[in-house]
């Protein structure tokens, strides 16, 4: 650690490798995020691929919670929340995607370290909405011509995760990783000691004797018992069909080469979002599965 700091690195990883036979990615997520805390920024990345010889689970699963920093952008207005320094800054940015890049350029991370898995080990996690393209195509797609946002969702929401848990399903190991920002401390020794304490705290949450219980749930699906088909939507079936015809005409005319049409269906539910994800990962596994929770 001290050698890396002396070499000029300002973002340093501390890690502990443990057995993973007592823990699953789903349980690890629940250890880090309480069931009733549905606004805690966090994520779970998994992968399952269907092959001719059967189902193959991806080698790595990654869990993260409590980001050190968050960036939220909406129509050029950017909010940067540094939870480590306890600061909040609001600014105008013609291209908000430059903000996380500018922040990262302030640091020199140690990205090569023996023992770190060849997987995502920490960094920015979040989402970019379709309207993010308006920051690039400012003339053709200005925000002034954007459709009404009845959800009031941000264009960009990113979290910088210094604490991550990486499951290696091949070697049956779990890497618990904490990244230390030297700019948050007065000395390297202080940074190292606090980093060790934070890593131990992360480990203790995974090893807690009060491990949260996961509901057994039910994989049996019977959509008929939930009533009639979804009726509440953003458009009628006929309007959607007309949109498909219009899209084909634009493609034939050479205006576009592809288009993504969407139709939102809604239904009131009291289901827990994470429990819905647990069901989806069983009934519809995919190579890129993610559960993302933001404020």
Q: Where do the protein language model's features map onto the residues?
A:
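Extended alpha-helical targeting/anchoring segments
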Residues: 1-295
């Amino acid at each position: 650690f001290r050698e890396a700091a002396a070499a000029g690195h300002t973002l340093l990883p501390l890690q502990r490798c443990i057995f993973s036979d007592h823990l699953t990615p789903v349980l690890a997520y629940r250890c880090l995020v309480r069931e009733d805390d549905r606004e805690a920024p966090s994520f779970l990345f998994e992968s399952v691929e269907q092959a001719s010889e059967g189902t193959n689970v991806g080698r790595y699963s990654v869990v993260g919670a409590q980001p050190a920093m968050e960036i939220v952008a909406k129509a050029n207005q950017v909010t940067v929340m540094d939870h480590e320094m306890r600061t909040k800054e609001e600014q105008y940015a013609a291209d908000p995607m430059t903000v996380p890049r500018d922040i990262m350029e302030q640091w020199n991370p140690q990205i090569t370290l023996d023992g770190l898995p060849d997987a995502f080990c920490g960094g920015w996690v979040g989402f970019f909405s379709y309207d993010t393209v308006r920051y690039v195509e400012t003339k053709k797609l200005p925000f002034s011509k954007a459709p009404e946002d009845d959800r009031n969702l941000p264009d960009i929401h990113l979290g910088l995760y210094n604490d991550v848990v990486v499951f290696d399903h091949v070697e049956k190991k779990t890497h618990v990783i904490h990244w230390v920002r030297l700019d948050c401390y007065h000395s390297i020794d202080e940074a190292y000691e606090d980093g060790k304490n934070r890593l131990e705290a992360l480990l203790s949450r995974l090893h807690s004797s009060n491990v949260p219980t996961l509901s057994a749930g039910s994989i049996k699906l019977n959509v008929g018992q939930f009533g009639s088909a979804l009726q509440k939507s953003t458009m009628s079936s006929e309007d959607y069909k007309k949109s498909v015809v219009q899209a084909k005409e634009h493609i034939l005319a050479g205006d576009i080469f592809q288009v993504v049409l969407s139709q939102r269906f809604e239904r009131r539910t009291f289901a827990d979002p994470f429990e819905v994800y647990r069901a989806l990962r069983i009934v519809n596994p995919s190579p890129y599965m993610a559960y993302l929770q933001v404020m």
